[in-house]
Amino acid sequence: MDIVGGQNLRQMWDDLAGVYGDKTALIFESCEGIVRQFSYASLNEEINRTANLFYALGIRKGDRVALHLDNCPEFIFCWFGLAKIGAIMVPINARLLGEESAWILQNSQVSLLVTSAQFYPMYREIRQDNSTPLNHICLIGEQLPADDGVSHFSQLQARQSATLCYTPALSTDDTAEILFTSGTTSRPKGVVITHYNLRFAGYYSAWQIALRDDDVYMTVMPAFHIDCQCTAAMPAFSAGSTFVLLEKYSARAFWDQVRKYQATVTECIPMMIRTLMVQPAAPTDRQHHLREVMFYLNLSAQEKDAFTERFGVRLLTSYGMTETIVGIIGDRPGDKRRWPSIGRVGFSYEAEIRDDQNRPLPAGEIGEICIKGIPGKTIFKEYYMQPEATARALEPEGWLHTGDSGYQDEDGYFYFVDRRCNMIKRGGENVSCVELENIISAHPKIQDIVVVGIKDAIRDEAIKAFIVLNEGETLSEAEFFSFCENNMAKFKVPSFMEIRTDLPRNCSGKIIKKNLK
C-alpha cells in the first residue's frame, strides 16, 4: 500500500500552497512574545527563497547542510528548502557543545551550517581548528561578525526569487534528512530519513489523531527532534491545519498559549505535565479547546489521573522512536483508553514481543518490542555510514529491534516496561528503572526522580535515586527509604539517594543518565 503516491516534499508544498493559499499554515511565538505568521502560500514562497539561497551558495542535490537552531520559522524554511532541491538536512541538538557538534559535522561531512548568534562562537572555534569540513556559516541574527566565510541568512534570503530556480529530479526514496539520535547512553547514530518517510509520517500521524484542516496543532517540542517534525509539523501541514510553534517551553505561559491560539491538539512529555501540575490552580484550567494531548512515556497512574482531572483533557499515548519515524503503537481518538497500555499497533506496521533468542513470546510474557515496517518508507532507511549498527537493529525482512522491554495482552494492547539498557541487574533480579521512578514520583514532596544503576561488587549493581524536591520541601534519607520500603519489593529499594536542584536533560526532555552516577 503506497499512501504517499510518489509525491516528494517539493510536490507536497507546491500542492499545499495551491489548495490552501491564504489559510494560516504557521504561527511562531518567540520567548519575548513576538508573533510571526505565514499562510500556506507565503510559507511556500519563503521555502522557495531559502532553497534558492542554498543553491546560490553552491548546495546541490545530495549535499548535507547542518542546522543548529532553537525553534524558529527559519528552521521550517531551511528544512523544506533543502528538500526542494534534493539536499539533506542535518539538524543538531541545540544543547550540544562544541566537541559533540563537531563530531556530527565530521561524521556527516557537512560543509555549510545555518545557526544563530547564540551558537556562533562555538562554530568559530570549530572552523579555526580545521577538524571538520565546515567552511561556510549562514547566520541568523541582527549583527554579522567580520569573519570570512560567514553570510547573513535573512539578507541573502530576502534577495532571492520566490520561484524555485533549481529543480533536480527527485524520488520519494531520496534522503531528506540525517537525524542524529539523542545519545543519552552512547555516541549518537545518524538516522537516515527519506522523502517517503516524511510524507508517510504526515498522513499516518494525521490519522492517529484524526487531524482536520480546521485543527490548530501547538507544540513546544524542539524542531530538530523527530516528535516535532513527524508527529506535529508533518501531520499539521499534510492535513492543512494551522501549526503553532513556540520557541521554548514555559510552564507559567503554556496553558495561556493553549487558550490564546485556541489549540485543539498539543503534545506533552512527563516533565511538562509535572511542571504544569505544580503551577497554581486557576478557574481557567479547563477553559480551552483541546481535544487531544499527545503523550510520550513515562507517567504514573496517579500523575495521569491528577492531570486529566485538573485540566479536563484526554492523554493519547504514542510510542515510537527516531527509527520508527512515528508513534507506531498508540491510542486512537475513538477508543477507550486502557491505561497503562501504550495502545495498539497502527496501520502499515506489525509488532511482536520476542525473547533473547529472537522468538515470538505469548501474551503476558516480557520481552523485546519488535516492529515490522518497510525501511525507507514506514521506518528509517539505515544508520548513516554504519552498516554494522544497521544490521544489528534492522533485520532484512524489515523487523526493527527497539531495545525496549514490554509485553502485550490477549486483546493486542501493548505495555511498555523499560528500555532494555535501562534495566538494573541486582543480585540476579532485573529491576525496571521506570517502575521505580513511577512509584517514587507518587511521594508528595518529590517533583522529579530518576534512578540509575551503579557498580556493586557483590550484587552486580546497586540502585541510586536522584531526586528534585518541590519548592520549599525537605526530605530525610530515613523518610525516603521508609517510603520505598512500604511501596516496593525489598530488592527494588534504592541503596542511595541524592537530592539535586535539577536533573540533566537534553532538548527533548530526556534525562541524560550517563551524566548521573
Swiss-Prot record:
Pathway: Amine and polyamine metabolism; carnitine metabolism. Its EC number is 6.2.1.48. Pfam families: AMP-binding, AMP-binding_C. Transmembrane segments: none annotated. Signal peptide: none annotated. The keyword Ligase applies. One of its GO terms (molecular function) is medium-chain fatty acid-CoA ligase activity. Keywords: Ligase. It catalyses: 4-(trimethylamino)butanoate + ATP + CoA = 4-(trimethylamino)butanoyl-CoA + AMP + diphosphate; crotonobetaine + ATP + CoA = crotonobetainyl-CoA + AMP + diphosphate; (R)-carnitine + ATP + CoA = (R)-carnitinyl-CoA + AMP + diphosphate. The keyword Ligase applies. InterPro entries: AMP-bd_C, AMP-bd_C_sf, AMP-binding_CS, AMP-dep_synth/lig_dom, ANL_N_sf, CaiC. CDD domains: FACL_DitJ_like (cd05934). One of its GO terms (biological process) is carnitine metabolic process. Gene3D superfamilies: 3.30.300.30, N-terminal domain of ligase-like. It comes from the Bacteria. PANTHER family: ACYL-COA SYNTHETASE, MEDIUM-CHAIN ACYL-COA LIGASE ACSF2, MITOCHONDRIAL. Belongs to the ATP-dependent AMP-binding enzyme family. Catalyzes the transfer of CoA to carnitine, generating the initial carnitinyl-CoA needed for the CaiB reaction cycle. Also has activity toward crotonobetaine and gamma-butyrobetaine. This is Crotonobetaine/carnitine--CoA ligase. It comes from Salmonella schwarzengrund (strain CVM19633). The lineage of its organism: Bacteria, Pseudomonadati, Pseudomonadota, Gammaproteobacteria, Enterobacterales. The gene is caiC.
